[in-house]
Amino acid sequence: KRAARTLAPFLFWSLLYWVRPFVLKQATAPMSAKGLFLAIFNNEANYVFWFFYCIFAVYMCLPLFSLAADKKNIKTIEYVCVLGFVFNSVLPLVNRFVIPVYGGLTPVIVTGYVVFVFMGWLIKNKDYTKKARILIYMSGIFGAALMFFGTYIVSKKGGETDTLFMDYTSIACLPMSAAVFTAAKYIKWERLFRIIPEKFIRA
């Protein structure tokens, strides 16, 4: 059901953007089945749709991941999250500033955006003390500062925009995501709804 809700808008917008140049007579190639295939399967309808493909890749893994989705496996999920942080967030810094490490060493289970699935599940199902939550929030603030100032420093040094700290699984962005997930879990929504109408928040 989750995949279907995502697939429908993806197909709609992909087809719309694929047909658009032909309707406006701006197409640089004739309409063809190959063109339609490339638009849908090679992200040639509109480059901003890249995130759909990442979501679909994660969705295809969920039936397997669901086998581990049990609170008795929290320690295992914590281990996977640590692996994800080390290989997705720390290793790129080691490669850049210390010494190259072969990328094939990265465990397949934490490649791409899959780490967000494990991290989200862990935060949802584990209870964190106030001290632990403060540490998570502080790491998120640190990540935001690192993304801004770190990107400025490495970009200035390289003479062009450097995305080392801007990648979604970078050492800057992953802690920010954890902080947002944690805040969403522990925020007192009922108090917020008293101040701001619920319909505006959900919108």
For every predicted segment, state its role.
Residues 3, 55, 180:
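Divalent metal-coordination and catalytic microenvironments
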Residues 3, 41, 200-203:
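Hydrophobic alpha-helical elements at and bordering transmembrane segments
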Residues 1-2, 6, 73-81, 131-140, ...:
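Membrane-interfacial loop-to-transmembrane alpha-helix junctions, especially the N-terminal start
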Residues 1-27:
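Membrane helical hairpin/interfacial module
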Residues 130-202:
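Alpha-helical transmembrane segments and terminal signal-anchor/GPI-anchor hydrophobic tails
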Residues 17, 21-25, 30-128:
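Hydrophobic alpha-helical segments with transmembrane-like composition
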Residues 2, 72, 103-106, 163, ...:
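Juxtamembrane loop-transmembrane helix junctions in multi-pass integral membrane proteins
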Residues 14-15, 19, 81-95, 139-154, ...:
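Aromatic-anchored segments of alpha-helical transmembrane domains
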